Every structure is written in structure tokens, then in C-alpha cells.
Amino acid sequence: MHLSQIVLYLSLLIALGPVVLSDQEAHQQPSVSTPVDTDQCATCEVRQQIKTMRLNAIKSQILSKLRMKEAPNISREIVKQLLPKAPPLQQLLDQYDVLGDDNREEVLEDDDEHATTETIVMVATEPDPAVQVDGQPKCCFFSITQKFQASRVVRAQLWVHLRPSEEVTTVFLQISRLIPVTDGNRHIRSRSLKIDVNPGPASWQSIDVKQVLTVWLRQPETNWGIEINAFDSRGNDLAVTSAEPGEEGLQPFMEVKISEGPRRARRDSGLDCDENSPESRCCRYPLTVDFEDFGWDWIIAPKRYKANYCSGECEYMHLQKYPHTHLVNKANPRGTAGPCCTPTKMSPINMLYFNRKEQIIYGKIPSMVVDRCGCS
């Protein structure tokens, strides 16, 4: 190659070099804003993943806290058949209507793993044939679960629905404990209540059966059930003891109030955000759990509640529980994986539900609502 050609080649290389580099930079320039959009999309995806994980965790937690391996197979139609049309149950349902998502206390139980039961409603079933004569009586047996054994019974009320009376009359509501038939005897008279009834619509009446329940708890083998009668002055039995046509949901039931020990309170603080918040730090976000979406018709109330979830970044200095933690992490940054955004305060929810024995339970399930989030 001649010297003149070499000089020309070098001159072109020097002249065109910057132009090529400028073209590359021009092509790369629009991609500068891409990481920002990618970060925003990534944040949305992370939150969505956290919400999905939280919902799945809530399903597992509820079953675990209620000591269930799987959800009871109770459909909406069965719920309508089993749900008593009774005053105390309606009061519990009205409580949810009035209180909504605020029907929980700012406390946590000592047992944070399992549900603390407050009220159990047991619908009467047919007693064992050993205490029946010619298929009678058809009522009433109450299955006493182990839940009672570890609890303190505060109150036990038997609710009986009385058919309407055409005249003013005195009704004697009688409760008799059933025993296996021997020598024609199958009863042990337990309680009797005198009731003055006015003519008019049907009514619910209650009678204290704590003493009867106490006997069953101490001697489970004596629980064969009870017979209920409510005779008026003419000898008519006004008590509804079985679900005859037109009397569905009016069968007797027992309402038991129990207590399971003290509770303890906890306090904390944190940040609250919504889904449109630009906050990148650890924050509490809203999340509504809908049991109907789960297909869980066995939960009577609430049908939905606000569970919330935690999401965000945690710097060593941000919302740490102890001030010295930041100094330790700064001195040894490789000695820890760093704080995570997690719930620092949780509270229970009240729930009315059917268990596997088709008993209606009103209880408090601990640690189901995220009240505060923090880095720990």
C-alpha cells in the first residue's frame, strides 16, 4: 500500500470514528427511560405476588387455627337448613352488620396459634335408639366436643321454640335427661320452668341448663340427651323439637358461653399506604379477603374482612425495633441478611362458622389482621 493511501485511510478512520460512536449513542439514548418503567412494573408484580401469597396463607392459617385439615363440605343450601332462626344467633349476625370490620379488639390472646372460642351453638339431633321407645323421642341429643373439656363454662342456655297459643295459658317447660330404657323408665327429671303465654305469635324461650351440661362434662357416659316438653293447660305440647315442614330452623339448640383465659395487649407503629402510593419504604397496604370467593359457605359471618399485607424496602435505619441494631449492622454489614418488611402487630377477627359436626361456633381467631408493618 502506498504511503498516500495509508495517510488517506487513517484520515478517514479518524474522521468517521466519532460519527460512528455518536450514532451508537443516539440509538441507545431512548432506552434510558426503560429501567424506570421496568422498576415500576416490577414493583406492581411484587405486590401482586405478595397479595396472592397472603391470601393463600390466610386459607391455611384459618384451617390450622380451627384445627381443621380441610374446609367442611357444607354448601349454601345446607347452611340455610341448619341455621337456627333464633334470637341469640340473630344478635351475633346483627353485630357484624353494626360493627363491620371494627368488630375486633386491639388485643392478642396468649395462644396465638389456635382460635379462642367464645360461644358455641349446638343444634339438637336425634338421640340414640337405646333411649327411644317406638322411635320416640326424636329429640334431643347434643354432641359435647373435647373443646368444652379444656374450657370454663360461663353460661349454658337451652333455647326452645313454642308454637303459638290461641288463648292465655300457663306453659310448663320441662327438661328431662334421657337414660337407656330399663324397667320402662327412661327419664331423669332435670329442670322445669313455668311460663305465662299470651295468645299471639310463636316465641323463643330459654332455660338455664348449665347444671345439666356440667354433669355431662364430668360424666360423659351419662350424656344420652334430653327430652323437651312444653305442655299448656289443655295438655298440648307447644315445643318444636324436630324440623317438621314449615318449622325448619326452629329445632332446639344449646348456647354455651365459655372462657379460655386472659389476653395480653401489644403496641407498635408503622406506615399506612394505598395501592397508588409512591412510598417505597416498608408499608401496610389494604387487602380484602372474600370468603365467598374461596367457596367457603361454611363461614356464616363475616363474609369478608380487611386482612391487609406488608410490602416495601427496608434500610437498616428504617423503623428498626431497637436503635442499637443499626449500629451493629453498620459495624458488621456482612453479618446479617438485612431487615425484612413484616407485620409487627396483628389482631384477631370474630367469626361465626360451622364445624365438621355441623355445630355453629362463634369464636375469635388470632393474628388474622395486619395492623402495623415494620422492618425486623
From Swiss-Prot:
Listed GO molecular functions?
Answer: cytokine activity; growth factor activity
Q: What Gene Ontology cellular-component terms does the record carry? A: extracellular space
Localization recorded for this chain is: Secreted
Q: Which domain of life is it from?
A: Eukaryota
Q: Which UniProt keywords apply?
A: Cleavage on pair of basic residues, Cytokine, Disulfide bond, Growth factor, Secreted, Signal
Subunit and partners:
Homodimer; disulfide-linked.
Q: Which family does it belong to?
A: Belongs to the TGF-beta family.
Name this polypeptide is given = Growth/differentiation factor 8
UniProt organism field? Oreochromis mossambicus (Mozambique tilapia)
